[in-house]
Amino acid sequence: TDSPIPAPAPAAKPKRARAPRKPASHPTYSEMIAAAIRADKSRGGSSRQSIQKYVKSHYKVGQHADLQIKLAIRRLLTTGVLKQTKGVGASGSFRLAKGDKAKRSPAGRKKKKKAARKSTSPKKAARPRKARSPAKKPKAAARKARKKSRASPKKAKKPKTVKAKSLKTSKPKKARRSKPRAKSGARKSPKKK
C-alpha cells in the first residue's frame, strides 16, 4: 500500500522542472530585438521582418516567435526603449532609443516591479479600514431603508397620474378619428351610384 503513494509525487516534480528550462534556450525577446537592431545598423532603422529573420537565425526560438516579437516590439515602444522611424504600431522601422537598450530594459523592469509593490501596499492599508466600516454600515443601511420607504409612495403616485392623463388624451383622439371615417363613407356612397 505504501509504494503507490510516493510514485505520483516524483511524476509531478519533473513537469514543474521542465517549464523553466524552455526559456533558458534563448534570452528574452526584448534583448534579442535589441541585438537584431544593433546588428542591422541601417540609417532608416530595422524592419520587423529583418528583426524576425535575425532572431530566428541566431536563436533557438519556438513556432510562435513572430507573434512574441510583435508583442515585444509594442512593449518596447510603450516603454520608450525603441523609437519608430517609419510606419505605425508593430509594423514599420525601429531604432533603439539613446543609449543601449540592454541597459535600459532591466531598469524598466525594476520600475515596474517597484510600482507593483507600491500598488499592493496601499491595498493592505485599506483592508483594516474596511474592517472598521461594518460598524457604520448598519446605520447607513437603516437610513437608506428610510429613504427608500419615503421615496416609494412618491413613485407609486407618479404612474397613477400618467395613466389618468393617457386615458383623457386617448378618448378625444378616438372620437376625432371616428368622425372623418363617417364623412369619407358618405362621400364615397354618391360616387358608387
Curated annotation (Swiss-Prot):
Where does it localize? Nucleus; Chromosome
Biased segments, Pro residues type: 1-11
- Where does the record place Basic residues bias? 13-24, 104-193
Supply the Gene3D superfamilies for this chain. Winged helix-like DNA-binding domain superfamily/Winged helix DNA-binding domain
GO molecular-function annotation terms?
Answer: double-stranded DNA binding; nucleosomal DNA binding; structural constituent of chromatin
Please state the protein's primary subcellular location.
nucleus
One GO BP annotation here? chromosome condensation
Q: Which SMART domains match?
A: H15
Keyword terms, alphabetized: Chromosome, DNA condensation, DNA-binding, Nucleus
Report whether DNA-binding shows up as a keyword of the record. yes
Entry's Gene Ontology cellular component terms = nucleosome; nucleus
Tissue distribution is: Erythroid cells.
**Annotated region described as Disordered, given as residue ranges:** 1-29, 80-193
Q: Which PANTHER family match?
A: HISTONE H1, HISTONE H1.0
Protein's recorded name: Histone H5
Record organism: Anser anser anser (Western greylag goose)
Lineage of producing organism: Eukaryota, Metazoa, Chordata, Craniata, Vertebrata
